[in-house]
Amino acid sequence: MILSLLQEIDEICRRNKIEYYLSPRLTLCAVEGHPFPQNPMFGVVLMKTADMERFRLAVDEDPREKRALESMKSHKWFSGFYLRYTNTDTLCLNLDNTRDYAFPGIGVSIFPLRTPAASVKAERRLSRDENAWTELCHINHAERNFRSRVNRTIMRLQCMITGRQGQAAHLYDRLVRFCQQPGANKYILKRRKQTTVFPAEIFAESKRVTLEGAELQVPAKTAEYLTISYGKNYKDAKEPRYVTSIALVVSARVSYTQFWKESGNFEKYCKERMKNARKLARSRRHKDYFNECWDYVEFCGERMNLSVSYEKQKDYIKNLYKNEDYMTLERVFRPYFKMMQKSLQKNELFAEDEEIFDIYVDVLEKTGKTVQRSKIGTLI
């Protein structure tokens, strides 16, 4: 199914003289003769930003039966700056993110090869707005820090003013306009969890390769393309074993409309599932916070026990220090050194006894352990 969609994309691109490239994973399969990936989400091609917009317009002008092209221009819950070319007579639905696509069928994602924006300021503003939009679409997985909350609030206000669909389309147009600067020396592939930077020369030319009997297009400099994506040993890269997610429903025989009908009140089901997913995400955050607190309690207990141990050795340590036996003191302070390292990672000092602490700091200087000594100096 994905292969047939790739062939259709190839046909549309050749007819309209649009350049495209198979994703690094599919290119590796074609070049090294690996089997086609089983994961239905691995159908990916890349296009330069301007070419991606031309492709969108070409499909809109000549739509095909049982096919849909989705983007932020057409769907107010579309979560990112890319396109998705879908077979609407199939089913590929993530039950935890039911709003992602208006047509949740098996499809091919078309990701843009972006150029950096004309200025650093514009780049930061675009990145801020794009991240805020993505987090609004997947609120259960959003960052919880102050800056992210502020950015999401601003995006919500903009959605209230222009409407959610209007804001999505406006953001898409901005990204298209600013991410296709002429004369750029690099292209950026931005995915949800990974960003890859390619030299522009890699995409200067293309060539045809065979993938599962179908002729498709990849960058002419295939070796460089795959080396950046997988490293020098890309030929040894293995396809990860695919295990279907519990939340993913996939079928090439049943359409998403049939699935919705058989599910009864699907809208109600989606709302309940999203509500439960929100509760689960909240409980996970509480659990993480509890685990963090418990780890800190254990750390404090460990530190207290060690301080009691050194309190018992205090006279012995003072005698060694008086006799300037720094070799023995270094050995005695090894557990103290490790505990100090852990404390410094938390921006704290292990200084339960000031007298022992002063001796320890002097021993650090005498034994040449200047790195930890300088870190302690910044906190004193």
Located regions from the model:
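Alpha-helical junction/boundary sensor with strong preference for TPR arrays
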Residues: 300, 340-344
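Generic helix N-cap/helix-start motif at coil->alpha-helix transitions
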Residues: 307-313, 352-355
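Conserved catalytic core of two-metal-ion nucleotidyltransferases
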Residues: 1-14, 56-128, 132-229, 236-276, ...
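Alpha-helical repeat scaffolds
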Residues: 293-297, 328-339, 369-380
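Residue-level signature for tetratricopeptide repeat
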Residues: 319-322, 363
